[in-house]
Swiss-Prot record:
Gene Ontology molecular function terms on file: serine-type endopeptidase inhibitor activity
Record function comment: Inhibits trypsin.
Entry keyword Membrane: no
Disulfide bond annotation, renumbered to this chain: C7-C29, C11-C25
Entry's localization field: Secreted
Keyword Disulfide bond: yes
Major localization listed first in the record, in broad terms: secreted
Protein name in UniProt: Trypsin inhibitor
GO cellular component, one term: extracellular region
Signal peptide feature range: none
Record's keyword terms, sorted: Disulfide bond, Protease inhibitor, Secreted, Serine protease inhibitor
Source lineage: Eukaryota, Viridiplantae, Streptophyta, Embryophyta, Tracheophyta
SUPFAM superfamilies: VhTI-like
Note: Differs dramatically in structure from all previously described families of trypsin inhibitors. Consists of a helix-loop-helix motif with two alpha-helices tightly associated by two disulfide bonds.
Amino acid sequence: NTDPEQCKVMCYAQRHSSPELLRRCLDNCEKEHD
């Protein structure tokens, strides 16, 4: 079980093609660990 910070690091590592995709990834991190 990854913590939110670890999840966010993964999002940034993916280098999404658009800021919107990155934001969606980060939002999912928050939701998963609510």
